[in-house]
Curated annotation (Swiss-Prot):
Mg(2+) binds at residues 59, 93. This is ATP synthase subunit s, mitochondrial. It comes from Homo sapiens. GO terms for biological process: ATP biosynthetic process; proton transmembrane transport. One of its GO terms (cellular component) is mitochondrial inner membrane. The gene is DMAC2L.
Amino acid sequence: MMPFGKISQQLCGVKKLPWSCDSRYFWGWLNAVFNKVDYDRIRDVGPDRAASEWLLRCGAMVRYHGQERWQKDYNHLPTGPLDKYKIQAIDATDSCIMSIGFDHMEGLEHVEKIRLCKCHYIEDDCLLRLSQLENLQKTILEMEIISCGNITDKGIIALRHLRNLKYLLLSDLPGVREKENLVQAFKTALPSLELKLQLK
């Protein structure tokens, strides 16, 4: 068996990267592989199953409609009829989900809550994509975005398109600087929204 150092050294050689960068690039490459959308898989098993596989592969958890328990083990995803398990909530705490994977969410029709906490690969593009998905515009009721350092005002303001959003928690987001503008934009677009800001 080849040691990790040799493998990553070979990967760096292929990409012509300096050895000191190999670990960072290796993990970035691996996370991109985990996030890659397989449209054939979505067609074969349905959007909820394919999205569950993506989320769990990246370290997130899902809870299905009508169930109390969070599903966090990829190897114990439930089997059965494709339309039986519908994702109701997503907890992406400490996960490696990134924008290239967000097309997995396109067919989801029952997601009510999303928690993004310490997601180092989440950027404004992710929130923009999320807010453009018509199904999610209708179903998402609650969102929490905590300690995601790459999120700025641009990404947050896009969430005003989630027209049934009732609760939004924003905490420890150093890239969010225009708090007053955000508050005003959400008051105008979503007057019944409970907006909680824990920002500096």
